[in-house]
Amino acid sequence: MPTDLHPDLAALAPLLGTWTGRGSGKYPTIQPFDYLEEVTFSHVGKPFLAYAQKTRAAADGKPLHAETGYLRVPQPGRLELVLAHPSGITEIEVGSYAVTGGLIEMRMSTTSIGLTPTAKEVTALGRWFRIDGDKLSYSVQMGAVGQPLQDHLAAVLHRQR
């Protein structure tokens, strides 16, 4: 654990670093797709982790999505995720985390979604993360454009050294 990591984040120290891997997406309104992803968790000694994510198409490397924000720990076992998307969406997700041995599981769902006038309608989001050593797995559920909350993304990433 980094010596300057805020003590409230000690349980989430295994998230720190850069993770890369591959994922797949689906939704009733689009064709299924595969993507390559890079996620970085960093810190500045305050009680939050900075989060940055970007994806590109697995087939041709074209940029797909990005998001940036902060993962906060307001109290042990609780999480708050604050994110901004360049597509005109902001989200606040609230949830919990559990640490069992070397395994961390986090579950969150939206309590607030902000949309710019030109953003596509998104009504609900949820995320599940599992960190097991140097492997990070996640899934994202989304309710958008008239569709109910359902599976949208899943990926497996590996820590880069």
UniProtKB/Swiss-Prot annotation:
Q: Which HAMAP family does the UniProt record give? A: nitrobindin
> Known catalysed reaction(s)?
peroxynitrite = nitrate
Q: How is the cofactor bound?
A: Binds 1 heme b group per subunit, that coordinates a highly solvent-exposed Fe(III) atom.
What GO molecular function annotations does the UniProt record carry, in alphabetical order? heme binding; metal ion binding; peroxynitrite isomerase activity
Q: Which NCBIfam families does the record match to this protein?
A: PeroxynitIsom
Q: Which domain of life is it from?
A: Bacteria
Question: What cofactor does its activity depend on?
Answer: heme b
Its domain description in UniProt is: Forms a 10-stranded antiparallel beta-barrel structure able to accommodate a hydrophobic ligand in its interior. In fact, this fold hosts the heme group, which is located in a wide surface cleft.
Under which main EC class is this enzyme filed? isomerase
Q: How does it assemble?
A: Homodimer.
Quick check: keyword ATP-binding in the entry? no
State one Pfam family annotation. THAP4_heme-bd
Q: What is this protein called?
A: Peroxynitrite isomerase 2
The UniProt keywords, alphabetically, are: Heme, Iron, Isomerase, Metal-binding
User: Which CDD domains does the record cross-reference, listed alphabetically?
Assistant: lipocalin_heme-bd-THAP4-like
What function is annotated for this protein? Answer: Heme-binding protein able to scavenge peroxynitrite and to protect free L-tyrosine against peroxynitrite-mediated nitration, by acting as a peroxynitrite isomerase that converts peroxynitrite to nitrate. Therefore, this protein likely plays a role in peroxynitrite sensing and in the detoxification of reactive nitrogen and oxygen species (RNS and ROS, respectively). Is able to bind nitric oxide (NO) in vitro, but may act as a sensor of peroxynitrite levels in vivo.
Please tell me where heme b binds in this chain.
H152
Q: What is its EC number?
A: 5.99.-.-
The family annotation for this protein states: Belongs to the nitrobindin family.
Which organism does this record belong to?
Answer: Mycobacterium avium (strain 104)
Positions of short motif GXWXGXG: 17-23
Is the keyword Heme in the record? yes
**What PANTHER family is this protein classified in?**
PEROXYNITRITE ISOMERASE THAP4 (PTHR15854:SF4), THAP4 PROTEIN (PTHR15854)
